[in-house]
């Protein structure tokens, strides 16, 4: 039985892909068979008439996953917009059945699977025949979540609002990770202290441009649940 976790964030460009790659890399370095999946990706680069799923490509390179990164993404769009708008612009109907089928195929190849979301937790994936929000994907795949937040000014507000929304939607939250953390920045230090003292969820950090996570492998494994 595979185990999985979902990576979401307090907003766009917080560092989900960067952290996801480091998580998978850390697990694979100790011979844990960990893979990657993403339901919808926008902003893909076109090379020789082929769209390249940039986030997946980055994760595959950093974590040393073999195979075609595009196979880890159900829907790939060139426009750098929200998935629901990209789908509309390309006349594509996003299907939850396809997402669940693709995820099932991916998880059968690995013992651990790390799923990356799009944007923040409140992200429209499809507004076509099926109305799909990112939260619907998390719940359909029956995954707990890790929340990535920026370490800087404003993160207390953004993080707590994100957590409140997720709890209202009954999405289990395993940890918060403050990205771009600087151990000498008084704002970063205070943000971590406040969140750690006022939440019942573990708070970890990831320094900017780090090639490793300051989280023991044994602890990381605990965040994954059977799926």
Swiss-Prot record:
One of its GO terms (molecular function) is dethiobiotin synthase activity. Keywords: ATP-binding, Biotin biosynthesis, Cytoplasm, Ligase, Magnesium, Metal-binding, Nucleotide-binding. Its EC number is 6.3.3.3. One of its GO terms (cellular component) is cytosol. Mg(2+) binds at residues 17, 55, 116. It comes from the Bacteria. Homodimer. HAMAP family: BioD (MF_00336). Belongs to the dethiobiotin synthetase family. This is ATP-dependent dethiobiotin synthetase BioD. It comes from Clostridium botulinum (strain Loch Maree / Type A3).
């Amino acid at each position: 039985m595979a185990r999985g976790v979902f990576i979401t964030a307090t907003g766009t460009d917080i560092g989900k892909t960067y952290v996801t790659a480091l998580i998978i890399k850390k697990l694979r370095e100790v011979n844990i068979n960990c893979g990657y999946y993403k339901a919808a990706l926008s902003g893909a680069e076109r090379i020789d008439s082929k769209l390249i799923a940039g986030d997946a490509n980055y994760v595959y390179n950093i974590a040393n996953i073999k195979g075609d990164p595009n196979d880890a993404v159900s829907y790939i769009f060139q426009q750098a917009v929200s998935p629901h708008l990209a789908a509309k612009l390309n006349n594509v109907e996003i299907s939850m059945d396809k997402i669940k089928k693709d995820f099932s195929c991916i998880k059968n190849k690995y013992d651990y699977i790390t799923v990356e979301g799009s944007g923040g937790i409140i992200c429209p994936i499809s507004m076509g025949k099926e109305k799909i929000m990112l939260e619907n994907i998390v719940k359909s795949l029956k995954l707990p979540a890790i929340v990535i937040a920026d370490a800087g000014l404003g993160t207390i507000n953004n993080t707590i609002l994100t957590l409140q929304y997720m709890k209202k939607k009954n999405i289990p939250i395993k940890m918060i990770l403050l990205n771009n953390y600087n151990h000498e920045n008084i704002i970063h230090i205070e943000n971590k202290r406040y969140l750690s003292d006022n939440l019942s969820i573990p708070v970890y950090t990831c320094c900017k441009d780090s090639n490793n996570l300051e989280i023991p492998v044994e602890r990381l494994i605990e965040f994954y649940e059977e799926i």
